[in-house]
Amino acid sequence: MKNTQKVALVVGAQGVIGRGLVDHLLTLDEWEVTCLSRRGGTDASAGSMFEGRLRHIAVDLLDPEDTHRKLSGLREVTHIFYAAYQDRPTWAELVPPNLAMLVNVVEAVEPIAPHLCHISLMQGYKVYGAHLGPFKTPARESDPNHMPPEFNIDQQNFLEARQRGKNWTWSAIRPSVVGGFALGNPMNLTMVIAVYASISKELGLPLRFPGKPGAYDKLMEMTDAGLLAKATVWAATDERCSNQAFNITNGDLFRWNDMWPKLARWFELEVAPPLPMSLEVIMADKEPLWNAMMAKYGLKYNYKEVSSWVFGDFVFSWDYDMFGDGSKARRFGFHEFIDTEEMFFRIFGNFRERRVIP
């Protein structure tokens, strides 16, 4: 390995955050990238622009033996970008698998990677209790922890304890709701809106906001996956960011009562008054319709791959303000921002180009 070469291990590389990280790292010539996921992927082929720089490993991170066996050759890793997630029905049930996966990765790689410089941990606003109900806004990185269970906090505590006396450092990245491209992902709001709008259009219906009445008027923010990737790599490579947490957001706020009509216009839909309804319930019978739409419009992805209804219900239930203070990242040197409206339109266009939606 050249002294100037950086070797990234992206954990959870098929998710909306992991995909963004991989895409960004491959634009930077000094990086080689190894991707971990349950499904694996296709390595860069000979003669391609990423030849020798991209490879995939399919691994069950909940299995310590499989993790150690599959990762035993990763001796040149310099940076671990951890963005894996396992969904569970309750907050308490989220803790054991999500903590175990991080522990298994670190315990497999750290002892064999002498050049390890940094471990980046992807978190979120659950650290602030945002999922539990109205919380202090803007949320700041210095805010105190809340009553457990909370796997994000347990993961950070593990890294802090593991890092003491070591040469490597860590960072904790805290985005808001992330917008980007990923299939079969349980937390993809842009996919929720795109598929919901496409089905509404196919049925000749206006686009109704389906969340709680109070959620339509509250302040909200999002984080573009590309912006998040840039910030994550910045924090992992800037010494000023060692052992720090950062809120990372697009930099603007919005309310659904202003954004929703703009999204409807992109899909050439009228807007009707909000109507509280569970997407998980009302979209449960729409698979036959989606199959017909796949045939009609030449769409490439089945209903299961594009469905994130439970997460949509979760986000649209926030009848309280949901935003953090992003000034710490700016004070430390990260100044990029993205207009959230433009982010939505770009991602929807990307879905259309890839034949995810009509």
Report each predicted region and the residues it spans.
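Glycine/proline-rich active-site loop of Rossmann-fold NAD(P)-dependent oxidoreductases
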Residues: 166, 178-196, 226, 235-246
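Conserved Rossmann-fold NAD(P)-dependent oxidoreductase catalytic core, especially the SDR/UDP-sugar
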Residues: 78-82, 86, 92-151, 171
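Mid/C-terminal beta-alpha module of Rossmann-like enzyme folds, strongest
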Residues: 229-312, 325-327, 331, 348-355
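Conserved Rossmann-fold cofactor-binding substructure of NAD(P)-dependent oxidoreductases
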Residues: 55-77
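Conserved glycine-rich Rossmann-like NAD(P)H-binding loop of the short-chain dehydrogenase/reductase
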Residues: 29-42
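Active-site Tyr-X1-5-Lys
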Residues: 145-176, 181
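A conserved pocket-lining segment of Rossmann-fold NAD(P)-dependent short-chain dehydrogenase/reductase
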Residues: 195-223
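N-terminal Rossmann NAD(P)H-binding glycine-rich loop of SDR-like oxidoreductase domains
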Residues: 2-28
